Amino acid sequence: MPVITLPDGSKREYDAPISVMGVAADIGPGLAKATLAGVVDGKEVDASFEITQDVSLSIITAKSEEGLEVIRHSTAHLLAQAVKQLFPEAQVTIGPVIEDGFYYDFAYSRAFTPEDLVVIEEKMKELAKADFDVTRRVLPRDEASAYFRGIGEEYKAQIIDSIPANEELSLYKQGDFEDLCRGPHVPSTGKLEYFKLMKVAGAYWRGDSNNEMLTRVYGTAWASKKDLKAYVHRLEEAEKRDHRKLGKKFDLFHIQEEAPGMVFWHPNGWSIYTAIEEYMREVQRLNGYEEIKTPQVVDRSLWERSGHWDKFRDNMFTVESESRDYAVKPMNCPCHVQVFNQGLKSYRDLPLRLAEFGCCHRNEASGTLQGLMRVRGFVQDDAHIFCSESMIQDEVSVFTDLLFKVYKDFGFEDVIIRLSTRPEQRVGSDEVWDKAEKALSDALDAKGLPWQLLPGEGAFYGPKIEFSLKDCLGRVWQCGTIQVDFSMPGRLDAQFVAEDGSRQVPVMLHRAILGSFERFIGILIEEYEGAFPAWLAPTQAVLLNITDNQAEYVKKVENSLKNKGFRVNSDLRNEKIGFKIREHTIQKVPYLLVVGDQEVENNSVAVRGRGGEDLGVMTVDAFTALLEEQISSKAR
């Protein structure tokens, strides 16, 4: 008879087989009520799963990530059940869990509308309230395929037909609706209380643009009303901060159909861009980087030698000229090796740090493009460090210090670090990988930095560390990376003369801090909601005259501040001062400098912050000192 070991090490012995729910009820009625599923010997199972032998068991409730996934997967089925009741001719396809929710794809004679979603959600609530038991049965593959074809679900049958013939498949039924799924699911639909349908989109069957277009319905589901409300609030905040809307509001950039995934930078946006570039150029110079510039279009032979032509060709823009094939570079690394290869290098030249604000182009699918966050043309703060194996740890350590300084200057201090180690398919010996992985982990440990291990997630050419930022809405953005590369230098004939006179292949460290400038600026726009710190703001201050009497003085001060390198403008329009203040406050200019007769007489300005705070009357020199301090300290 089964002996069940619980997570706290305690054991429970039973005289007969018992279900996961039965064990939960034996522990206590509160746990039984909260039980959604279980984990038996490491495998997730339904609450109805019968235990017949000695096992380890943990109960899944809504308080865990596993529980939340069960809720979301089950809610996707609830959505499909509601759609089938409301639109019987619709066919169901797939409905996976995604971050913060789920989606389900449907084949129907028309796309669903936002009005349809309201009706579908109400039907889902009705079905949840009915509290249908969710039951599981198993069928052989061919029998499952025949079953779904028999009820008119051709898409499900196609999915099943692609599964090996000897497989048994599980089906889950609730009320009159049955769907294919590996499970586990909640015990009954009454467990599904806190959900919301979010939007409708199009999706090709099996992700292939040659197939028919389906309707994808997105939803979210949570363990409590409080969690659902908080998520909806975050979405509303994200919508309010959407960089595409703010880009238009603050006249920063636009993207148009004639150049999909390519950015048209407006003066305000380009001001931010160049401020970031100048900042990165200076911090890299101070940290031993030498800036280079490499060609935009390169013969395919280099990409063949580097391995990119075989692995990345579909994502490359190519062109033919004079019977030669060229590619617009999708990354900078092969070109950086060409710079390294010019002239024989010695061990005394290492580490050699080559940096480029490299413009790259990748032929991303049009459906994946999203404002500045996913583009086809972008610039990276790209650099490659050529060094010996013994230098890896020190270089990673120095780079990490630089990365954290840069992130802090931009206002990000919550950084998630992940170390990805060797995959099954890789180049290089285990001994070399051991050294490289240890160098990366030791560099992080020496700084006392917390990090997560991702076994097997490294690139085929070497392990890597990825640095992700968490923004004010709790969203995570992977920006920085440092990757060890044992492959490319050798493929492209890079060598240096070692201390013993032998020729050796250097290790190459690929590294970036911001990643794509475009994406990083998109993150900044949303993080600051357009209220950029003074050092980044397109316009750092605006001078406002009260009457025409101050116009000459205002222009004089404007020119003086511009000559000091500040980004300032003047507003001499014949409008009431209150109107002008409101207009520039809406534009989130850091400082408004109001000038009346008294300010002219005293060679001063009345300073207002963008939040409406009165900073008092200052001499022009005093304001200059204030702005210089704000810029140099990277104050937020």
From Swiss-Prot:
Main location class: cytoplasm
Organism, scientific name:
Saccharophagus degradans (strain 2-40 / ATCC 43961 / DSM 17024)
Its name, as the record gives it, is Threonine--tRNA ligase
| GO-annotated biological processes | threonyl-tRNA aminoacylation
Q: Which gene encodes it?
A: thrS
The record's region (Catalytic) falls at: 242-533
* Subunit: Homodimer.
Write down the required cofactor(s): Zn(2+)
The record's comment on cofactor binding reads: Binds 1 zinc ion per subunit.
Output the PROSITE patterns linked to this UniProt entry: AA_TRNA_LIGASE_II, TGS
